[in-house]
Structure formats: structure tokens, C-alpha cells
Design a protein with these regions (language model features):
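Bacterial N-terminal signal peptides that target proteins for export
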Residues: 1-8
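Surface-exposed interfaces of beta-sheet-rich extracellular modules
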Residues: 285-306
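Conserved "repeat-terminator" motif of extracellular CCP/Sushi domains
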Residues: 314-330
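Extended beta-strand-rich segments in extracellular/periplasmic secretory proteins, especially
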Residues: 132-205
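N-terminal leader/targeting segments and the immediate start of mature chains
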Residues: 18-89, 163, 235-249
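Bacterial N-terminal signal peptides
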Residues: 11-19
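An acidic-aromatic
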Residues: 78-144
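Non-transmembrane domains of secretory- and envelope-associated proteins
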Residues: 25-33, 196-257, 261, 265
Length: 331
């Protein structure tokens, strides 16, 4: 039994997101800007909220590059998301270089409005996974995997070191220190469009304090935002994982049951109080069921055959059946 936040480790491993900053950026004394301007981090956060960006743009694209302490590139990534008929669609692609110590080579992910499919390739294996969202968790999870700026963090003390104007753009330098750490911190340099308060670029450098007291650079991650590019996934991962009900491919027929709303009140809903869904997935696909509550998985209606979370649902055969029980209902 694991929470949905812990279940999405695979999907989140490529999304080392931006850290935020706090404080005001007063520019009224800068003669290089024609009109006096005051900017706060709260205003930046509101302008760059992912839902706010989708209200102003058809698509949002984020590119990422991570360098190690020696400035060697370890990872590059591209994220893109849009909104179609009130559903957020998204995809990302991460590449790991020979300088990376992660053991991975590439990761693709695609979210289609209700599910999220991912394909991970490492030096020795290829893994497929499918995240199935229950109780309206889809949109929030998908948005959480996409870099945002500035992000809201707890237990971090943030200070604005400088704010200036250059070539018609605002440059904001921030230092953030972890309150629970004895010397670890990161710095952020934001480049902002003063007309919209949208962050155009951000460079985040992490520093770590060693036992000797020496502080050294850990890595630097650079982010760049662009808008209204054509929405086009680099790889259609969903089609590699999920198949239509009338397809002829040799796949696994997965049936999963979930307590239907109202069943706890004795209402006649679904099959004996269960809602049932049927999908067809590629053999060997790791299935993740995500919910706001912890979940228990069972292979039988009587709930006597638990499915180990780490072993997961066995999709190697012709069919598989899962009964999903939220923890508070699991008596």
C-alpha cells in the first residue's frame, strides 16, 4: 500500500523541477526602464502558473539542460503541454548523456487526458508503464511533472540579491537556503518579460556543504520557455502501451474494479458496488493506479489475494484482473 505520490517515482525522475524564490524586486529607481515598476515573486508566480499560461497561449514549451559540477552536460529535456476541450495534454522527452550517473539513457512520457504512458530505456532494459488516475488526480499530477517557475517551497529562506534591466528584459538574482540544512543552498537567475511577467529563462545552481565545511557546486540546470509552437510529441508512447479493444495484437486484457461513488451508501451502482473498466496493454507494462488516498490492490473480489505494490499487476499473460480499494475503505 503506497500513496500516489510515491507511486509516480518513475514518471517524476526526469522532472527535476525549478525551485522558487521570495521577496520584492523594486525597479522604480532604474532610469533604463521608461516607467517605474515594482515586481514581487507572488506576481511572478501568478503570471507563470501553468493554468494561467494556458489561458494566454495555445501551447507552452520548456527546454531543459543540466550540467554537472564540471559543466559537462548530463541531461537534456523537452516538455510541451496544451489544453484541448478542458483536458490538459502533455509530453516530455529526456536524454541522459554519458556524463550522467543515473544509469538511464532516454525517457519518453505522454499524457492523453486520463492516463499517462511512459517508456524508460536504460543501459540494459526497456520499461513501459501506464499511470491510471482515479478521483480526478490526472490534471494535477501532469502539471506537477512540468517545470514551473517560480515554484512554491516550504522550509526555504529566500532573498533577492539583485534586480536589473538588460536589453528590455528584467534580470532577477535570488539565493535560497534550506532551513533544515547546515549550509546547502541554491541560486537562481531569472530572465523575465516585463510586459507580461512571464519567465523566459532561468538558471538554477545547487551548492552543497561537505562535512569538511567546504561548499561546492553540485550542478546547474537551465530552463527556457517558449509559447504557441505546434503541439507535436516526439514519440507516440501511448500507442506503444495502450491498444484498442478490437486490436489483433498479442496484448494483455486488463480489467480493474474501483468502488463506485455511492456504493458506501448502499446505492445500486455498477457491478455490486464496483465500477469496472477494461483496457488492453502491452505485455510487461507496469500499471500504476493513482489516487488521493493510499490504495490496496487485490486479485479477487473477496479481497483475499493481495497484490504486492512493488511486484505490481502481472501483465505478462493474456489477461489480468485488479480490485482497487482506497485505504480508508479497506477493512
Amino acid at each position: 500500500m503506497k500513496s500516489w505520490k510515491r507511486a509516480v517515482t518513475v514518471a517524476l525522475c526526469a522532472a527535476s523541477l525549478l525551485a522558487g524564490c521570495g521577496g520584492d524586486c523594486g525597479l522604480s529607481g532604474d532610469d533604463s526602464i521608461s516607467e517605474p515598476q515594482q515586481i514581487t515573486i507572488e506576481q511572478l508566480r501568478a503570471a507563470n502558473d501553468q493554468r494561467s499560461l494556458l489561458e494566454k497561449h495555445d501551447t507552452v514549451t520548456v527546454t531543459v539542460q543540466e550540467n554537472d559540477q564540471n559543466d559537462a552536460v548530463t541531461r537534456t529535456a523537452k516538455f510541451q503541454y496544451t489544453c484541448v476541450v478542458d483536458e490538459v495534454l502533455a509530453w516530455y522527452h529526456c536524454r541522459y548523456t554519458e556524463n550522467s550517473t543515473s544509469g538511464k539513457s532516454e525517457l519518453w512520457s505522454e499524457a492523453n487526458g486520463t492516463m499517462d504512458a511512459a517508456r524508460m530505456e536504460s543501459d540494459s532494459t526497456e520499461d513501459l508503464s501506464l499511470s491510471i488516475y482515479l478521483e480526478g488526480m490526472y490534471e494535477q499530477y501532469v502539471l506537477d511533472t512540468i517545470p514551473r517557475c517560480p515554484a512554491l517551497e516550504e522550509d526555504v529562506e529566500q532573498t533577492v540579491d539583485s534586480c536589473s534591466e538588460q536589453d528590455g528584459e528584467l534580470l532577477l538574482s535570488v539565493t535560497a537556503r534550506y532551513l533544515a540544512s547546515d549550509g546547502d543552498y541554491y541560486t537562481v537567475l531569472y530572465r523575465v518579460d516585463p510586459a507580461t511577467n512571464e519567465v523566459l529563462e532561468a538558471s538554477v545552481t545547487d551548492y552543497i556543504k561537505k562535512e569538511s565545511g567546504e561548499v561546492s557546486k553540485l550542478h546547474t540546470t537551465r530552463y527556457r520557455w517558449s509559447y504557441d509552437e505546434p503541439y507535436q510529441a516526439e514519440r507516440n508512447v501511448m500507442n506503444e502501451v495502450l491498444f484498442s479493444t478490437d486490436s489483433t495484437e498479442d496484448v494483455c486484457d486488463l480489467t480493474y474494479f474501483y468502488p463506485a461513488p455511492g456504493s458506501e451508501k448502499g446505492w445500486d451502482v455498477g457491478e455490486n458496488g464496483w465500477s469496472v473498466s477494461e483496457i488492453r496493454v502491452a505485455h510487461g507494462t507496469r500499471i500504476l493506479f493513482l489516487d488521493s488516498a493510499d490504495l490496496a490492490l487485490y486479485a479477487d473480489r473477496e479481497l483475499t489475494k493481495p497484490i504486492d505494490f512493488y511486484d505490481g499487476v502481472d501483465t505478462s499473460g493474456e489477461s489480468a484482473t485488479v480490485y482497487i480499494v482506497p485505504l480508508e475503505e479497506n477493512h
